[in-house]
């Protein structure tokens, strides 16, 4: 076996947690990440049939039976991941019946996987049903989009349209729009179920007054989605409350033209023309 610290997926996780912390989106122990690992990725680094311990999940994860995930730990600080991955991360395997998980590696000084494990696994189930190339769920406390949930209507169509109007690239990056979940108690199966339901048709779920969850085929993909939403929200928060108001923005007609140029289909019900007829 090779050193797991040299595994590309481990190096990428360490880099990503540093990026999130440096952006100010992972204060204290805030934020969590999970990545589905392919057998070909992990076979040279870890014996996936050797378990350190097993714990019940408390929900049915049978669609993920036998799958292995690299997951951030509960109560762990993203800023510490790079200097001590084995204490702050873990690798888990969903049991054959989907009722529990096995710890394969990590959490060397004790602990459990992220308290949002239910949200992560439920969202993985949904996204894999929509996209077999899906791999990553990322949750972080992005500042501007969290602030936006206090002052903007939480209607998903209105929220998405505002973001699309802030930066030209937004419609191209997330034509499937942004889903919004109202404030719910963190770390619960209920929040996981609500988030997963939203991920049937959107890769981005905003948790009102809390943060954002993004799904992607790679770490860069998931991070890029969150990064783009956050930048659009930051622009909105900087301009929306000027006494003059917003004097001009990208129009629906211009967004339709943009979608046609980049061959994307805007989520229905948001724009007044073409792919998003109201």
From Swiss-Prot:
Cofactor: Zn(2+)
Keyword Lyase: yes
Organism whose genome encodes this protein: Listeria welshimeri serovar 6b (strain ATCC 35897 / DSM 20650 / CCUG 15529 / CIP 8149 / NCTC 11857 / SLCC 5334 / V8)
Physiological role: Catalyzes the reversible cleavage of L-rhamnulose-1-phosphate to dihydroxyacetone phosphate (DHAP) and L-lactaldehyde.
Family classification: Belongs to the aldolase class II family. RhaD subfamily.
Main localisation: cytoplasm
GO annotation (BP), single: rhamnose catabolic process
Record protein name field: Rhamnulose-1-phosphate aldolase
Pathway(s) annotated for this protein in UniProt: Carbohydrate degradation; L-rhamnose degradation; glycerone phosphate from L-rhamnose: step 3/3
């Amino acid at each position: 076996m090779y050193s797991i610290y040299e595994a590309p997926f481990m190096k990428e996780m360490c880099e990503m947690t540093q990026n999130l912390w440096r952006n100010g989106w992972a204060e204290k122990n805030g934020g969590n990440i999970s990545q589905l690992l392919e057998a070909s990725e992990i076979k040279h680094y870890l014996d996936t049939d050797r378990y350190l311990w097993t714990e019940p999940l408390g929900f049915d994860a049978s669609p993920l039976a036998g799958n292995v995930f690299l997951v951030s730990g509960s109560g762990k600080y993203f800023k510490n991941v790079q200097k001590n991955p084995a204490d702050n991360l873990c690798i888990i395997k969903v049991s054959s019946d989907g009722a529990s998980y096995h710890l394969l590696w990590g959490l060397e000084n004790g602990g459990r996987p992220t308290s949002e494990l239910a949200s992560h696994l439920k969202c993985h189930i949904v996204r894999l049903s929509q996209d077999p190339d899906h791999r990553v769920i990322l949750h972080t406390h992005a500042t501007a989009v969290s602030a936006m949930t206090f002052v903007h209507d939480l209607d998903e169509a209105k929220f998405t349209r505002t973001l699309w109007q802030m930066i030209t690239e937004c419609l191209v990056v997330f034509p499937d729009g942004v889903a919004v979940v109202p404030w719910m108690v963190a770390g619960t199966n209920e929040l996981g179920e609500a988030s997963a339901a939203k991920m049937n048709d959107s890769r981005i779920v905003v948790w009102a007054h809390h943060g954002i969850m993004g799904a992607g085929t790679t770490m860069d993909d998931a991070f890029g989605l969150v990064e783009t939403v956050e930048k659009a929200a930051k622009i909105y928060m900087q301009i929306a409350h000027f006494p003059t108001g917003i004097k001009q923005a990208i129009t629906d007609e211009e967004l339709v033209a943009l979608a046609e140029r980049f061959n994307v289909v805007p989520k229905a019900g948001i724009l007044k023309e073409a792919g998003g007829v109201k």
